[in-house]
Amino acid sequence: MARFVVVALLVLLSLSGLEAVQRAPKIQVYSRHPAENGKPNFLNCYVSGFHPSDIEVDLLKNGKKIEKVEHSDLSFSKDWTFYLLYYTEFTPNEKDEYACRVSHVTFSTPKTVKWGRNI
């Protein structure tokens, strides 16, 4: 019984230690296909390498939140960090600016990464 209690305590301590680890997300914004003005495409925001899992991701058009956005299920890598893909249909043109805004405990303010059509 004492051995079980010791093992249980060690497991709990190791799990609580995982919550203390914080890793900032890496943010990548790109289109599914090479951008052509007036041609429908998909805008992707891939957020990876973050911990803990609580995160808020918004796709933006001219600084305003795009409402019709889909995303993958929250998944984790071998190192126990998390990753997600947010995406939406869009039609690029010369005047509109697109970006991905991410809020995470590792950022003091939300971080915004702009989409560059040549990336």
From Swiss-Prot:
Transmembrane segments annotated in the record for this chain: none
Chief location of this protein within or outside the cell: secreted
Disulfide bonds: C45-C100
InterPro entries cross-referenced by the UniProt entry: B2Microglobulin, Ig-like_dom, Ig-like_dom_sf, Ig-like_fold, Ig/MHC_CS, Ig_C1-set, MHC/Immunoglobulin
Subcellular location: Secreted
KW Secreted (keyword) present: yes
Function: Component of the class I major histocompatibility complex (MHC). Involved in the presentation of peptide antigens to the immune system.
Identification of the protein by name: Beta-2-microglobulin
Lineage start: Eukaryota, Metazoa, Chordata, Craniata, Vertebrata
